[in-house]
Amino acid sequence: MEYAAIHHQPFSTDAYSYDGRTVHIKIRTKKGDADHIRFIWGDPYEYNDGKWSANEQPMRKIAATEMHDYWFAEVVPPFRRLQYAFVVTDDHEDIFFGSSGVCPYNEKTLETIHYYFKFPFVHEADTFQAPEWVKSTVWYQIFPERFANGREDLSPKNALPWGSKDPGVNDFFGGDLQGIVDKLDYLEDLGVNGIYLTPIFSAPSNHKYDTLDYFSIDPHFGDPEIFRTLVSQLHQRGMRIMLDAVFNHIGSASPQWQDVVKNGDQSRYKDWFHIHSFPVTDDNYDRFAFTADMPKLNTANPEVQKYLLDIALYWIREFDIDGWRLDVANEVDHVFWKTFRQAVSTEKPDVYILGEIWHSAEPWLRGDEFHAAMNYPFTEPMIEYFADQTISASRMAHRVNAHLMNGMKQANEVMFNLLDSHDTKRLLTRCRNDEKKARALLAFMFAQTGSPCIYYGTEIGLDGENDPLCRKCMVWEKEKQNQDMLQFMKRLIALRKQENTLLTEGHLEWNLLDDKNDFISFSRTLDEKILIYFFNQGNVVQHISLRELNIDRNNKICDAWTEQPLHYHDVIAVQPGEFLILSAAAPV
């Protein structure tokens, strides 16, 4: 047994409160090393005849990566206190693993209390809690300047005719909030029930990430009344809205920064920024990346903190928005985000807080900052397998597993899953315009735990390279839309909403990872219901014999996509590039 590979970290994603009563426990071992693991646990104060009273239960292997296996146990401590350890078994030995590491498995070890891990008390206040509604939300991201032009009188004077050319960095086409209101029937018919808008606040650019005034809507987008109408109509339709907050930096044309430029070290705003010396030049202050027109805010400054918190609360109080997406969230200090979380959650307990983080976001997802992150590390291996074809099926699955194991279950359940955005190539372009690959990728992502998001235009076959080409004008002429893709997305969204509880909370198990033939199968299981997915990315037809699957022959089986009933003895062909979803449930 490889002792050095055994890992468990208390008070982390390895040991946490799931719901204020239930504790989730994970331990990692070398892949293929352990035959089974027993979880020893009990209340630290409970003794019988002078000996600590311990319970014992088997752990379940729930995931594997290229190098490790992950094991899981779930317990409900009667008095919300927990003392625990592990007994790891292979072909040759049993070992005890606890707070002192690996120890011999014997009576003396079992009776040495300080060898055990402790979970002193399961506090609800310490439990990661996210808004329940996010679990059933399918998001639709809108870049307002390119979605729809509802009021041409608001368009910038230099606005180009809608969709007349591929967008340049500084082009305007006149998209606005009225355009979004006008298309709500379309969005409702598509099936999405959450709208994420990139920034709508006053700013000189088309993207609005260079904010002038966070309290006002950009005049080319509309005014407070049309935004109020948008929020109201969304809520009437059972839909949510999330705004984009740029709190890492501000626009260089903002009054605060211009005051610093004018008055130097005499400016009342000089400590709002990270300025190295005066007077301000193009290279003596911190900014977003190396972008001169986006000076970085000093969020350790109490005045800046109050300013930003007032903004966050204003849009909740005045317009009842449902969430904040936080731009460049990983470059803002944790202290501020903890204060932000407390303030906005007190104002609206079910507000959704989403951070833009492109790497592992675990430090921000401990229950006192964000509910979720934009889940690029989770979906990137999917894209690399299906679209880029640069990794194998097993490599993809291992990376997906590793990412899931790095998070708490309740955090994974509300993560923001996306395949493209205003910052990336569009999905169809990443797939080299192979529509089958794009469909397979979407179906694969929609089968995973988390809250899925599609970028405007994906549903009608919009393509585009990296920024600015990924920000094309939405196509509204039906004859120019890919209607087959649109119908596909409607069905995919409907299926996700229909099976939402299973796809959010159900167990993921990889049934087959055939690297040679590029054929994948996995299942999502919850209670008596199971969905089994098959993806054929190879060049050969694959045949599925239902009787060879792990399905009770008395179960009701159907093709989940077409809802066509199937029979236990059926054999189904999965063509190259296609996928199949089977549904099986115990008869009612």
Curated annotation (Swiss-Prot):
Location of the active site: 327, 356
Domain of life, source organism: Bacteria
GO biological process: carbohydrate metabolic process
Keywords of this entry: Calcium, Carbohydrate metabolism, Cytoplasm, Glycosidase, Hydrolase, Metal-binding
Cellular location(s): Cytoplasm
Gene3D superfamilies per record: Glycosidases (3.20.20.80), Immunoglobulins (2.60.40.10), Oligo-1,6-glucosidase, Domain 2 (3.90.400.10)
Residues noted as binding substrate in the record, renumbered to the chain: 249, 325, 422-423, 467, 471
Alphabetized Pfam families for the sequence: Alpha-amylase (PF00128), Alpha-amylase_N (PF02903)
Entries under InterPro entries matching the protein: Glyco_hydro_13_cat_dom, Glyco_hydro_13_lg-like_dom, Glycoside_hydrolase_SF, Ig-like_fold, O16G_dom_2
Field pH dependence: Optimum pH is 7.0. Stable at pH 6.0 and about 80% of the enzyme activity remained between pH 7.0 and pH 8.0.
Alphabetized SUPFAM superfamilies for the sequence: (Trans)glycosidases, Glycosyl hydrolase domain
Temperature dependence: Optimum temperature is 40-45 degrees Celsius.
Enzyme Commission number(s): 3.2.1.-
GO molecular function, one term: hydrolase activity, hydrolyzing O-glycosyl compounds
Cofactor(s), names only, from the UniProt record: Ca(2+)
GO cellular component: cytoplasm
Cofactor note: Binds 1 Ca(2+) ion per subunit.
Record-annotated site: Transition state stabilizer: 423
Protein's job: Hydrolyzes beta-cyclodextrin to maltose and glucose, soluble starch to maltose and glucose, and pullulan to panose with trace amounts of maltose and glucose. It is also able to hydrolyze acarbose. Can also exhibit a transglycosylation activity transferring glucose or maltose to another moiety of sugars by forming alpha-(1,6)- and alpha-(1,3)-glycosidic linkages upon the hydrolysis of substrate at concentrations of 5% or higher.
Complex and partners: Monomer or homodimer; in equilibrium.
Family: Belongs to the glycosyl hydrolase 13 family. BbmA subfamily.
Protein name: Intracellular maltogenic amylase
Lineage of the organism: Bacteria, Bacillati, Bacillota, Bacilli, Bacillales
Gene (name only): bbmA
